[in-house]
From Swiss-Prot:
It catalyses: 7 malonyl-CoA + acetyl-CoA + 10 AH2 + 5 S-adenosyl-L-methionine + 2 H(+) = dehydroprobetaenone I + 10 A + 5 S-adenosyl-L-homocysteine + 7 CO2 + 8 CoA + 6 H2O. It comes from Neocamarosporium betae (Beet black rot fungus). Keywords: NADP, Nucleotide-binding, Oxidoreductase. It comes from the Eukaryota. Trans-enoyl reductase; part of the gene cluster that mediates the biosynthesis of betaenones, phytotoxic polyketides involved in leaf spot disease in sugar beets. The first step of the pathway is the synthesis of dehydroprobetaenone I by the polyketide synthase bet1 and the enoyl reductase bet3 via condensation of one acetyl-CoA starter unit with 7 malonyl-CoA units and 5 methylations. The C-terminal reductase (R) domain of bet1 catalyzes the reductive release of the polyketide chain. The gene is bet3. This is Trans-enoyl reductase bet3. GO terms for molecular function: nucleotide binding; oxidoreductase activity, acting on NAD(P)H. Pathway: Mycotoxin biosynthesis. Gene3D superfamilies: Medium-chain alcohol dehydrogenases, catalytic domain, NAD(P)-binding Rossmann-like Domain.
C-alpha cells in the first residue's frame, strides 16, 4: 500500500544542500500524485531509465518543486475504474512530468501514475532494469514520428506491414529512440537506413537496418542514397537534430520532397527545402495533456488522436515484448537509488555516456 506519510521523490530545486550541476534534490514526504482519469493506475516504482530530456527539461524549463523522471518499471498497486490492466501486474511505461500542471507525478519517485492504455506488461524473463530501459519515451516518440499524419505519416504497423517496403532514414540510429525506431520500422514493413558511428553499425544492422552510413564521412549523403538501392527516400527521422544532422537528412530526401521528423526545434536557416514537410515530434503529445512551456515549438495542446496512436502502438508492441524481440541500448546500471539517479543524470548531461542506457534500481 502507498505510504500515508508521503513518498520520496527527486524534485526540481535551486536550493540543493550539496553542490550539483543540476537543480535537483531528493525530497521526502511528498504528496502522492492523484489518478487524473479512470484509465490511470498508480505504480510502485521498481527501476527507472534515464533520458536526455530529464536533464534538458530541468535546465531549460525549470519548475520549482516539480517531480522529475519519465521511464519506469513497477507494479500496479491502484487502478482506476476503467483501467485496462489489473492490480499486481509488473509494467513499464512513462510519464512526462515537466509541465506546470503536474507537480507531483514523475518516474523518479516511489510511486508514479500512468495511463494503463500506454503501459506494457513485462514478461518474467525481463528484469526490472531491462523493463525500465524500454519504458515508453523511446517507443512513444518513435510511434508518433511514424504514425502522426503531420510527421512521417507512415501507415504500416507490425500487425499490418506496409507492402511498399519504403526506405526510411533514421539519423542517430544508435540512440535510444533510434534503436527502437529501427525495430518498429522494420517490423512495419519499411527499410530502415541508419546514420551512426562505425562502432554502432553492427548493432543497428542486427536490429533491422539494411545498412548504415557514418555521420563523420564526407560521403554520408551519397552512402545513404546508395543504401536505398535506387528508391527515392521520402521519409527521415532525425534523433539527433543539430545543424549537421538536419543538413544530411534534407540532402538525402528525394528531389520532389518528403517528410522530416525531428526531436528538437530546428533553426529556420537549416530548413532549406520548401518541398519537405517538417514536424518537431514531442513524445508527450501522446499523453493528451496540455503542455505549456512558454515556447512556441515545445508547447502543445492536448491531442486525443495522438493519444490513440500511442495506445495503438502499445498494443502492437506487447506481442513483440512477449516474444523477447524488443531490444534496447546496452545497459549501464548506476547504484544509489535516488542519489544515483542524480549522479547518472549529471553523467548524461556531461556527455560521458555514449551508446548506453543508464538505469537505476529504486526498490530497496
Amino acid at each position: 500500500m502507498p505510504p500515508t506519510n508521503g513518498q520520496t521523490a527527486i524534485i526540481q530545486s535551486k536550493t540543493c544542500p550539496t553542490p550539483t550541476t543540476l537543480p535537483l534534490v531528493v525530497a521526502h514526504g511528498r504528496p502522492l500524485p492523484p489518478l487524473p482519469s479512470s484509465h490511470h493506475v498508480r505504480v510502485r516504482v521498481l527501476a527507472v531509465g534515464l533520458n536526455p530530456t530529464d536533464h534538458k527539461m530541468v535546465t531549460h524549463f525549470f519548475m520549482q518543486d516539480n517531480t522529475t523522471g519519465c521511464d519506469f518499471c513497477g507494479i500496479i498497486e491502484e487502478v482506476g475504474s476503467a483501467s485496462a490492466l489489473p492490480l499486481g501486474l509488473r509494467v513499464c511505461g512513462a510519464d512526462f512530468p515537466y509541465r506546470p500542471s503536474n507537480p507531483y507525478n514523475g518516474a523518479f519517485a516511489e510511486y508514479a501514475v500512468a495511463d494503463s492504455r500506454h503501459l506494457l506488461q513485462i514478461p518474467d524473463a525481463i528484469s526490472n532494469i531491462q523493463a525500465a530501459a524500454i519504458g515508453a519515451i523511446g517507443w512513444g516518440t518513435a510511434a508518433l514520428a511514424m504514425s502522426d499524419p503531420t510527421a512521417l505519416n507512415l501507415p504500416g504497423t507490425p500487425s499490418k506491414p506496409d507492402a511498399r517496403s519504403l526506405p526510411v532514414l533514421v539519423y542517430g540510429g544508435a540512440t535510444a529512440t533510434g534503436i527502437i525506431a529501427i525495430q518498429m520500422l522494420k517490423r512495419s514493413g519499411y527499410i530502415p537506413i541508419a546514420v551512426c558511428s562505425a562502432q554502432s553499425a553492427p548493432l543497428c544492422i542486427s536490429l533491422g537496418a539494411v545498412g548504415t552510413a557514418c555521420y563523420t564521412s564526407t560521403t554520408c549523403v551519397q552512402d545513404i542514397k546508395a543504401l536505398a538501392n535506387g528508391q527515392s527516400i521520402k521519409h527521415a527521422l532525425d534523433c539527433i537534430t543539430d545543424p549537421e544532422s538536419t543538413t544530411v537528412c534534407l540532402a538525402s530526401l528525394a528531389r520532389i520532397g518528403g517528410r522530416y521528423a525531428c526531436l528538437e526545434a530546428v533553426s529556420d536557416a537549416c530548413i532549406t527545402r520548401r518541398s519537405v514537410a517538417v514536424k518537431v515530434v514531442m513524445g508527450f503529445e501522446g499523453q493528451n495533456f496540455d503542455v505549456d512551456l512558454g515556447h512556441p515549438v515545445y508547447s502543445r495542446k492536448a491531442n486525443p488522436a495522438l493519444h490513440a496512436v500511442a495506445a495503438q502502438w502499445a498494443a502492437e508492441l506487447q506481442p513483440l515484448l512477449n516474444a523477447g524481440i524488443i531490444k534496447t541500448q546496452p545497459l549501464e546500471e548506476i547504484e544509489g537509488r535516488f542519489e544515483g539517479v542524480i549522479k547518472a543524470l549529471e553523467m548524461l548531461q556531461g556527455g560521458h555516456i555514449k551508446g548506453k542506457k543508464l538505469v537505476v534500481n529504486i526498490s530497496s
